[in-house]
């Protein structure tokens, strides 16, 4: 069975991490969780242990891109060949913020996209607010009647269930093509899923992303410099929904951490 490594990046804001962890209780069984913590000063690390999630900590804050790259390296390190000579462990890597809610079924829909289309990176839909600058990912672009329920975190599972209901109805009318994934020129980095083909775009043996972009620009630069020139566009899976609170962590809050390197914000 192909498995997925879900890497969640954290820096404080443990109240949102708790909400995220609670949503993970009902997701698919073939998903393992790894938390990369950027030197939180609250109870985030203790909470990870309470929920039974593996967590990698840092002695000092090194930024979001460092966390992404550590997650990617762990993904690569956990490939191995078992006694039967078959690849084992993870075929898929998800990198996600902690301020999200993942409904049951959303990851399966993303995985199904990889089995049908030749993509290396796929993203879910979210609310218009949650997708920020990339409105192509907004669920309201692809379905009618999802708002205002989709904007309420209490309905995140119901929204995913309604999407599957629509998918079933469209399949019965032979119009399933309407829900085919859409290639995009950009994607929002709050949640993205990759398959093993992503290794072809790595920055170095241990890094997928350009490390000089310490907090911002990382997904955009990766997309424009790596994926698009190879005609391997990030694509939105219209049948997957992940709720994103958005704007939970701000640079001003991060600077309060005494161990937070000021160089994080000097990404030129």
Annotate each predicted stretch with a short phrase.
Residues 22-31:
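Short, acidic, metal-binding catalytic loop of nucleotide-sugar glycosyltransferases
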